[in-house]
Amino acid sequence: MKIKAPVITIDGPSGSGKGTVAGLLAKKLGWCLLDSGALYRLLAFAARNHGVDLTNEEALKLLAAHLDVQFETTAAGQGQRIILEGEDVTQAIRNEQIGSGASQVASLPAVRDALLMRQRAFQEEPGLVADGRDMGTVVFPDAPLKVFLTASAEERARRRYLQLKAKGDDVSLSSLLDEICARDERDTQRAVAPLKPAHDAIQLDSTELSIEQVLERILSEIALRDIAG
């Protein structure tokens, strides 16, 4: 029987830093990376482009099953490009409107089922770092290390505000805080795969921690469990 590649899951709410930490960790280990949130953002983006209502579960299920998407590592190896239907949409899916749409479609059971096997297909040698909201509870429940990363809503809004201002976007800190709180409520209260720590997850509050400190904490856990060999 073939032994599956190891998986490290990093779950948490919007703005907790899980995507940044997961990317740095995957690069450090030389492992594959799954940004599961990008799949839901891609679906929301594709739905908008194809005129599909975000409450039409059956149409979204079909769209999810046939998403023409590729994840490509950038030439510098510093990140990934996301290609949808032949178009680079890496930046286009990273706005607040698409993020809100992603949270909506992620609450639909048929959509989550359609994307489940696609996410599990990322589990390849030498290993996988998977970030999202239900990686440790639903997608990879047998992962040897599960991390649940959080931070206060105010800190998460502040981080997002600085990111968007750096890109030249005209945003309000108070509106971002409102959006994050609304998204938290949707994600934690949905009937299917609600956002919550796995029972065996390591919980880290990054409110007062730098990205480097969070990464070091996770690397220490990896060493203790001898996961990366």
UniProtKB/Swiss-Prot annotation:
Print the keywords alphabetically.
ATP-binding, Cytoplasm, Kinase, Nucleotide-binding, Transferase
Looking up Gene3D superfamilies in the UniProt record yields: P-loop containing nucleotide triphosphate hydrolases
Q: Name one GO molecular function term.
A: CMP kinase activity
Using the UniProt record, name the top-level EC class of this enzyme in a single word: transferase
Span-the-membrane segments of this chain are: none
Could you tell me where this protein is found in the cell?
A: Cytoplasm
Name of one Pfam family that matches? Cytidylate_kin
| NCBIfam families given in the database record | cmk
- This chain belongs to which protein, by name? Cytidylate kinase
Q: Origin organism of this chain? A: Pseudomonas syringae pv. tomato (strain ATCC BAA-871 / DC3000)
